[in-house]
């Protein structure tokens, strides 16, 4: 009998142990998503981030700096500039337009923009057409003590908090030379966006449609239906675009087919295919429109700055402090170097050398990372590089214009209703 009672007691203890173990396992599953790993050094921004809006310091002057040439692009960008003016609750005290065109229609459009708010918009007419090795002349117009947000004229979309986030990062980190935005269609960021899950499967529609929706929601991918084709279909990135004008790319319903789409060829590279392929850029743009529609911009964002060290980043959308540029003796920049070469490669490298030789009190890691960083929460979309000519045959310019009118343009240029 004693043996039997002993067995029962052992069984009772085993049951209690099993119950306790199950409880802790279950509790662990509940808690784990809420407790980040101590070794986790990279955190994407949570969806519906509830951080308080950034407040512009009273003693800070922020100027937009735009190298202007094309009405077809700026007709969309104009809405985002208006949203970001201090008059409308934004951070831009002024916008400086560097005119680099002789086209009468383009010039007339810019005059219209400036006339709408001459207090905030200023025009500088270059004495000659500027190109890669003469853009340095535009940087002479910076004024000391100001922060400048340089915006290419084919930036077609700017997230509402992008400029505040870039400028704040620069203010808080004065040793950083350049703060770049997290830009759609700016290698090598496309590779990162792909690996972070921000890009989706799209293919060009197989033939010209007989009817296309043309309402205010034209920009939304959901309004155009799914792509219809064989599951084995692929699109060679060297393939030319469809021949008809304003062709569409449509969402592929099967997510698994993304491996057959152009973005599957993305690499962490500055030039080559990731830079040249119009089809990759096209797919990135349509993916952005989908993410805006689905309120999924968190897919692109990250909190820790991405340091470029001595890698190039294109200067499509970035923040600099005027004194940092003016102290570099712009007039004597090497004549065989473009402004991008100087601002994101040569000047930061020289700055690091000077700090190291002067025995700067800054930690070595900070000195090494003082060059160029990506602000992961400053999203913007850059339309096109010269090698991406096929983009012009898509309906993307039309879609970005529809997006601006539907979501971002202020009524009569008035204050934001946010």
PLM features: residue spans?
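Short loop->beta transition adjacent to catalytic acidic/histidine clusters or analogous donor-positioning motifs
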Residues: 58-62, 85-96
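Long, low-complexity intrinsically disordered regions enriched in Ser/Thr/Pro/Gly
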Residues: 66, 93-96, 111-112, 116-122, ...
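C-terminal catalytic/acceptor-binding lobe
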Residues: 3-45, 56-58, 77, 232-418
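Conserved donor-nucleotide/metal-binding helix-loop-beta segment in metal-dependent transferases, i.e.
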Residues: 158-211
């Amino acid at each position: 009998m004693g043996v039997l009672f002993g067995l029962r007691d052992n069984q009772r203890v085993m049951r209690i142990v099993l119950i306790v173990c199950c409880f802790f396992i279950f509790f662990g599953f509940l808690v784990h998503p809420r407790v980040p790993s101590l070794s986790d050094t990279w955190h994407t921004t949570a969806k519906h981030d509830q951080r308080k809006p950034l407040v512009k310091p009273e003693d800070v002057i922020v100027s937009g700096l735009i190298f202007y040439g094309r009405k077809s692009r700026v007709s969309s960008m104009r809405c985002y500039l208006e949203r970001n003016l201090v008059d409308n609750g934004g951070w831009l005290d002024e916008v400086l337009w560097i005119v680099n065109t002789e086209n009468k229609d383009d010039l007339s459009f810019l005059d219209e923009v400036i006339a709408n708010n001459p207090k905030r918009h200023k025009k500088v007419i270059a004495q000659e057409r500027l190109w890669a090795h003469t853009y340095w002349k535009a940087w002479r117009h910076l004024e000391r003590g100001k922060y400048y947000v340089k915006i290419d004229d084919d930036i077609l979309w700017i997230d509402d908090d992008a400029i505040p986030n870039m400028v704040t990062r620069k203010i808080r980190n004065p040793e950083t030379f350049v703060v770049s935005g997290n830009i759609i269609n700016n290698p090598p960021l496309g590779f990162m966006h792909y690996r972070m899950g921000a890009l989706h499967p799209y293919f060009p529609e197989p033939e010209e449609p007989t009817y296309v929706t043309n309402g205010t929601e034209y920009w939304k991918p959901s309004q155009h239906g799914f792509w219809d084709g064989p599951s084995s279909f692929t699109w060679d990135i060297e393939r030319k675009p469809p021949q008809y004008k304003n062709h569409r790319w449509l969402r592929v319903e099967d997510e698994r087919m993304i491996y057959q789409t152009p973005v599957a060829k993305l690499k962490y590279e500055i030039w080559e295919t990731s830079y040249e392929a119009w089809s990759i850029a096209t797919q990135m743009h349509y993916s952005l429109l989908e993410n805006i529609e689905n309120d999924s911009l968190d897919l692109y964002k990250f909190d820790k700055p991405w340091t470029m060290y001595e890698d190039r980043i294109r200067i499509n959308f970035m923040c600099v402090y005027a004194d940092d540029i003016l102290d570099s003796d712009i007039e004597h920049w090497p004549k065989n170097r473009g402004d991008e070469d100087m601002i994101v490669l040569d000047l930061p490298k020289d700055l690091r050398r000077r700090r190291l030789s002067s025995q700067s009190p800054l930690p070595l890691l900070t000195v090494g990372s003082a060059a160029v960083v990506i602000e992961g929460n400053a999203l913007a979309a850059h339309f096109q590089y010269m090698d991406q000519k096929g983009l012009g045959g898509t309906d993307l310019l039309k879609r970005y214009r529809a997006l601006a009118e539907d979501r971002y343009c202020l009524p009569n240029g008035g204050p934001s209703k946010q």
